[in-house]
Amino acid sequence: MPNKLSHYDRAGRARMVDVSGKSAAKREAEASGFVAISAAVLGALPSNPKGDPLEVARVAGIMAAKRTWELIPMCHPLPLSLVDVEVRVCENGLAITSKVATTAETGVEMEALTAVSVAALTIYDMLKAADKGIEIREIVLERKSGGKSGDYRRRK
């Protein structure tokens, strides 16, 4: 493995990374995912009796990003300055994107990925009665900037 796994000590025990020696810096991350849904359910989205599932999913993603540190054991609580989640209808389902920013000692990749993941799970929850074949696919980090490891952009 080219890089040391930073969340383990020398004895192999899980640990939270000490970021106290790092300087706060502007950090951003973007993630995306896709929820495959039948055409019939896509066509019925506006009339869902539970409310607008796209808006509920968007808000759920924002809320989840802010609570990532409570969901993923070794994540730090971060002062997020931006969480933007978009859900848009595509030909075969719903495309979800997130953008998260902070000025802190560690990055926001996990927050961006959590936002997309929970938005996708919320869509599944709201539509599962109408379509048992819903598939959550391709949740990926698209881009990150800031920090010691430098910038990253996913190759497509």
Regions found by a protein language model. Give the residues of each.
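C-terminal binding/interaction regions
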Residues: M1-H76, S81-K156
